[in-house]
């Protein structure tokens, strides 16, 4: 295993988590904020050392082009910092979202992504209605369970037809608008909507 300083390990772990969560690497500024480095040049120095050690590859012409190379080397998160989050299959009307019959499996996530004092679940996305929000077909959204939402929140909602959908929420004068993030799709206009939760993150497997 390659010898890394704690700071280098923290940076590598953060890059991996961000790629898994969002599908693309963080910026130098985001890396600095995550590991407590105010100087971008210091972050660049650590990235250069990680590149020298063969753990990442960078494209100097693109600010976010950081490729993880140590695919066979796992960075382990201590078990006491992991939360097993239920992955919901079919959402059934009239039953709690995390009812046993709705759960397909459990997925381990770092506490930073799924705080243990909050009720969090995951849901697989089917379709391309939220692609402009960076949520793609077959992604898993990380959802904080709640029954209210603010305008502009991305939510999991149960429609009047008892169908669960992930859309951006807007409460307007005479109705509720569930807005897709895809210019080819029309909004869903409803009188009543049941909010199941607010999307707080995205998990993607890079093929």
Curated annotation (Swiss-Prot):
GO molecular function: DNA binding; serine-type endopeptidase activity
Major enzyme class: hydrolase
DNA-binding segment(s): 28-48
Keywords, alphabetical: Autocatalytic cleavage, DNA damage, DNA repair, DNA replication, DNA-binding, Hydrolase, Repressor, SOS response, Transcription, Transcription regulation
Active site: residue positions: 129, 167
Cited InterPro entries: ArsR-like_HTH, LexA, LexA-like, LexA/Signal_pep-like_sf, LexA_DNA-bd_dom, LexA_repressor, Peptidase_S24_LexA, Peptidase_S24_S26A/B/C
Signal peptide: none
Site (Cleavage): 93-94
Reactions that this protein is recorded to catalyse: Hydrolysis of Ala-|-Gly bond in repressor LexA
Domain of life: Bacteria
Protein EC: 3.4.21.88
Keyword Repressor attached: yes
CDD domains in alphabetical order: HTH_ARSR, S24_LexA-like
GO terms for biological process, alphabetical: DNA repair; DNA replication; negative regulation of DNA-templated transcription; proteolysis; SOS response
Function noted in UniProt: Represses a number of genes involved in the response to DNA damage (SOS response), including recA and lexA. In the presence of single-stranded DNA, RecA interacts with LexA causing an autocatalytic cleavage which disrupts the DNA-binding part of LexA, leading to derepression of the SOS regulon and eventually DNA repair.
Entry similarity comment: Belongs to the peptidase S24 family.
Subunit structure: Homodimer.
Protein name: LexA repressor
Protein species of origin: Bacillus licheniformis (strain ATCC 14580 / DSM 13 / JCM 2505 / CCUG 7422 / NBRC 12200 / NCIMB 9375 / NCTC 10341 / NRRL NRS-1264 / Gibson 46)
Gene coding for it: lexA
């Amino acid at each position: 295993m390659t010898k890394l300083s704690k700071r280098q390990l923290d940076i590598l772990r953060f890059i991996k988590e961000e790629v898994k969560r969002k599908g693309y690497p963080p910026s130098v500024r985001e890396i600095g904020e995550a590991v407590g480095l105010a100087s971008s040049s210091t972050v660049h120095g650590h990235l250069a050392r990680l590149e020298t050690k063969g753990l990442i590859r960078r494209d100097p012409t693109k600010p976010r082009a950081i490729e993880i190379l140590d695919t066979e080397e796992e960075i382990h998160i201590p078990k006491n910092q992991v939360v097993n989050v239920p992955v919901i299959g079919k959402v059934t009307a009239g039953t709690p979202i995390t009812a046993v019959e709705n759960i397909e499996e459990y997925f381990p996530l770092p506490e930073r992504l799924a705080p243990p004092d909050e009720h969090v679940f995951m849901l697989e996305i089917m379709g391309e209605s939220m692609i402009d929000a960076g949520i793609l077909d077959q992604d898993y959204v990380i959802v904080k369970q709640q029954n209210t939402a603010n305008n502009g929140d991305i939510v999991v909602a149960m429609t009047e037809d008892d169908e669960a959908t992930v859309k951006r929420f807007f409460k307007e004068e005479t109705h509720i608008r569930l807005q897709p993030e895809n210019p080819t799709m029309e909004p869903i206009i409803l009188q009543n909507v049941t909010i199941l939760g607010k999307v707080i993150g995205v998990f993607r497997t890079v093929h």
